[in-house]
């Protein structure tokens, strides 16, 4: 018998060619996307994004009977104005953080809980690629469910005659939604990779810290994601109707470039920190 025939499993593992970071991320993405789409979280997500669709149907039904679903200072708010309010209050202020918390914190925590993380880490792939691949799957999964909901709400509320004038603003709103999912997902991916009880910490951050600091005067709000994300909303809406109402709710509205710079900085920094945490942390599986 030769020495090679007595090689240990780890020696055989070491002899395998190591996949590149990009190729490994793509492989993990392919495997994770199907699992996410058919998971219980997707059912929860469908129920969450179904709320605005149901509300839009109610508004449409009210307006079909000649009544006004929303008035501001005695003036009727048009269909796209109602859509803008729903984008701000329901999607950006609630749905995006909720999905970021429940999906982002679970990217690595679920693997630890299911005791499958050892299998992933024994493959000849960079550890960080596991997180990036699962993060990309999270983005694809949430966008595949959330964006159709937004489009349904838009076409229910906005008259066909107003679509040519408002479709550009809709695209900006969809961009804000995508950016919000990306940034919250990146932040909570780090929380899930670094902390032991990530869901609790994520909920406290999104619906505790952010909500309290936004309501308080001072500079602390500048260290929240919601401050920069919601500050972009007036820029994404037409300069009439409900825009003045929304702008009145913001004591401070930073320039667009400042908001985008901070949001992309949050995204890059926390994804990098999450990747480093996965590469360096020693995960201990509970019996």
Segments predicted by a language model, with ranges:
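Membrane-interacting alpha-helical segments
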Residues: 22, 26-37, 168, 172, ...
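Membrane-interface helix starts
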Residues: 33-48
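Short cytosolic juxtamembrane segments of multi-pass membrane proteins
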Residues: 280-287
């Amino acid at each position: 018998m030769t020495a090679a025939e007595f090689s240990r499993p780890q020696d055989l593992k070491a002899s395998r060619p190591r996949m590149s970071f990009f190729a490994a991320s793509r492989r993990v993405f392919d495997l994770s996307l199907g699992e996410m789409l058919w998971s219980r979280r997707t059912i929860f997500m469908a129920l969450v994004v179904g709320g605005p669709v149901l509300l839009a149907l109610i508004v449409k039904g009210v307006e079909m009977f000649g009544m006004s679903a929303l008035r501001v200072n005695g003036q009727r708010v048009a269909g796209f104005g109602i859509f803008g309010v729903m984008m701000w209050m329901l999607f950006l202020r609630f749905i995006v953080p909720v999905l970021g918390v429940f999906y982002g914190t679970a990217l690595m925590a679920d693997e630890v809980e299911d005791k499958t993380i050892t299998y992933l880490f024994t493959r000849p792939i960079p550890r960080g690629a596991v997180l990036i691949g699962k993060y990309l799957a999270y983005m694809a999964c949430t966008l595949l469910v959330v964006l159709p909901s937004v489009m349904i709400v838009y076409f229910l509320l906005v008259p066909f005659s107003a679509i040519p004038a408002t479709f550009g603003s809709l695209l900006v709103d969809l961009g804000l939604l995508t950016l919000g999912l990306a940034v919250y997902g990146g932040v909570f991916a780090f929380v899930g990779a670094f902390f032991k009880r990530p869901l609790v910490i994520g909920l406290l951050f999104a619906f505790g810290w952010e909500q309290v600091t936004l309501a308080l005067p001072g500079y602390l709000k500048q260290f929240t994601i919601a401050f920069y994300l919601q500050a972009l909303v007036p820029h994404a809406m037409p300069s009439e109707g409900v825009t003045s109402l929304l702008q009145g709710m913001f004591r401070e509205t930073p320039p667009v470039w400042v908001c985008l710079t901070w949001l992309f900085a949050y995204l890059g920094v926390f994804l990098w920190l999450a990747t480093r945490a996965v590469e360096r942390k020693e995960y201990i599986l509970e019996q």
